[in-house]
């Protein structure tokens, strides 16, 4: 599936991933390939994602950490939409 992470400053990521975990209002939840469509609010926490060939632009690499093959990005809040196997995260 495609993951796009957008902040007010820039689009930080636009890459293929196999899973995405996000901090929802009622706790963390995960989306895998072909997940049902969803729109949800995100709270302060960590966005986590995995994939085989994730490409992060050099100028944004300092915003992400990698732990045990999983990329992580801290956010303050945001919104997530998954539709037609594409995840868009608008994050602060």
Question: What kind of feature is each model-predicted range?
Answer:
Residues 2-92:
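Compact, glycine-rich, soluble single-domain proteins
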């Amino acid at each position: 599936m495609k993951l796009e992470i957008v902040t007010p400053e820039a689009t930080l990521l636009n890459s293929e991933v196999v899973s995405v975990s996000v901090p929802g209002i009622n706790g963390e939840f995960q989306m895998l390939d072909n997940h049902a469509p969803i729109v949800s609010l995100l709270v302060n926490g960590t966005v986590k994602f995995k994939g085989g060939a994730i490409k992060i632009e050099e100028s944004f690499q300092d915003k992400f950490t990698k732990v045990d093959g999983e990329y992580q990005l801290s956010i303050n809040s945001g919104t997530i939409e998954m539709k037609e196997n594409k995840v868009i995260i608008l994050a602060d």
